[in-house]
Amino acid sequence: MTVHIHPAVDQGVKQGSGSFAGGTLVCKCQDRPVKVGIKGDVAHNHACGCTKCWKPDGATFSVVAVVPRDNVTVLENGDKLHVVDASATIQRHACKVCGTHMYGRIENKSHPFYGLDFIHPELFQEGGSAAPEFAAFVSSVIESGVDPSEMPGIRARLKELGLEPYDCLSPGLMDAIATSVAKSQQKAA
């Protein structure tokens, strides 16, 4: 039996073009869809097992990446957007009608990822954005209802797809967080 991760990777991870210049994210509404413009390619694209990220029906993981916040512009029907949870670190701006998360923004200027917005590359009208590179917060899928006995098969499938599974972020991103924290502590001393 094949373990389903996410429709964007279940048939294999499709590599990006290497020259993706950006595009338009579109929500799932047929009438007046929300459209968000993204300049440039995505970074740190990954499968995410956390329970906060939006994912399509039937997906075990979301697929999420980051872009500089200055590269994100609401193009159409922004009146349909609302923040899902105002108390969350990542302010997820979702369509009120279909529920699709269009972008997530960190407003806390001291957060290591401040200045980066989180997006779901599968929502691009255009193809060619950078491919998912790893899987983060893998154990968290248990919180969304996955039986713990399925975890070895899920981790094996992620590895088969070339998405190294982590129960936090990738080592490079964890290093970036630790570096940011260390710098802030040096300033405080």
From Swiss-Prot:
It comes from Rhodopseudomonas palustris (strain BisB18). The lineage of its organism: Bacteria, Pseudomonadati, Pseudomonadota, Alphaproteobacteria, Hyphomicrobiales. The gene is gfa. It comes from the Bacteria. Residues 20-167 form the CENP-V/GFA domain. Catalyzes the condensation of formaldehyde and glutathione to S-hydroxymethylglutathione. This is Glutathione-dependent formaldehyde-activating enzyme. Binds 2 Zn(2+) ions per subunit. InterPro entries: CENP-V/GFA, Formald_GSH, Mss4-like_sf. GO terms for biological process: formaldehyde catabolic process. The keyword Glycoprotein does not apply. Its EC number is 4.4.1.22.
